[in-house]
């Protein structure tokens, strides 16, 4: 009797492990499917050579990609647009990064089972990957306005601003000023004015750009020839820093 009881307990335990395993596989498949829907749309848009407007409402994710391929042939565009699945915040679930050259055009994560767009990047508002779950945002709104921000992706898939510089023309002194905050907004009332020349600001831009990491991209031309791979694992330390 005792042996039967032990056998039943072991059988129940094995069944639980099996069901948990199936649940995990289903979750992974679901994440792949959600990301694949986005990649399918991008692939179709680039392959067809049609404007992003033909794919419904005006969407930043499509516009960001279209900006970089509109002057290319469909074949060139499919080679130029890249993607990678990478766990950026150490939660064990990959984010979807899309880009061209080493510039990110889109970052997606999954929130509550739905695709969540973290950001879209354009030529004049560009994003780059710094490694360890961190990102660089560099943009310009003309000769008198530039931004330079550093961010990391938290465990909930939100961007957290670590440092944000921006330039501002002060008509009172007829001079460009540099401001800094950790809010990620170009608001001088929320910022600290820095004793920094434009030349120093330019050198800071160059210094941070030199820290940009090269990603293990796969081209859209290769998309569909195999399942997308999760590349790279990140872990979060007790201090909340993401490490590889």
Model-derived features with residue positions:
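Sec-dependent N-terminal signal peptides of Gram-positive bacterial secreted proteins and lipoproteins
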Residues: 7-28
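A glycine-rich, hydrophobic loop/mini-helix early in the fold
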Residues: 69-84, 94-96
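N-terminal secretory signal peptides that target proteins for export/translocation
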Residues: 1-7
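Beta-propeller blade repeat segments, especially FG-GAP/WD-type strand-to-loop junctions
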Residues: 105-119, 153
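Beta-propeller blade termini
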Residues: 79-88, 126-134
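Blade-edge motifs of beta-propeller repeat domains
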Residues: 29-77, 115-126
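Acidic/hydrophobic-patterned starts of short beta strands in beta-sheet-rich repeat architectures
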Residues: 88-99, 134-137
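Acidic, small-residue rich beta-repeat scaffolds with periodic aromatic anchors
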Residues: 28-51, 138-244
């Amino acid at each position: 009797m005792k042996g039967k009881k032990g056998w039943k307990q072991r059988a129940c335990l094995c069944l639980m492990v099996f069901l948990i395993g199936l649940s995990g596989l289903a979750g992974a498949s679901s994440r792949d499917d959600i990301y694949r829907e986005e990649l399918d749309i991008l692939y179709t848009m680039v392959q067809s050579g049609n404007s992003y407007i033909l794919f419904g409402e005006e969407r930043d994710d499509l516009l960001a990609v279209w900006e970089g391929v509109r002057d290319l042939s469909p074949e060139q565009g499919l080679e130029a647009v890249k993607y990678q699945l990478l766990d950026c915040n150490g939660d064990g679930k990959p984010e979807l990064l899309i880009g061209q050259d080493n510039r990110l055009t889109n970052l997606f994560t999954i929130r509550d089972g739905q695709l969540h767009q973290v950001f879209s990047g354009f030529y004049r508002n560009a994003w780059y990957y710094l490694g360890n779950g961190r990102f660089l945002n560099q943009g310009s709104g003309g000769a008198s306005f530039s931004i330079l921000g550093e961010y990391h992706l938290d465990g909930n898939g939100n961007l957290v601003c670590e440092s944000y510089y921006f330039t501002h023309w002060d008509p009172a002194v007829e001079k460009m000023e540099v401001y800094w905050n950790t809010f990620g907004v170009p608001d001088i009332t929320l910022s600290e004015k820095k004793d920094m020349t434009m030349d120093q600001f330019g050198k800071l831009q160059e210094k941070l750009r030199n820290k940009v990491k090269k990603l293990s991209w796969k081209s859209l031309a290769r998309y569909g020839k195999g399942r997308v791979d999760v590349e790279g694992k990140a872990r979060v330390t007790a201090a909340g820093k993401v490490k590889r």
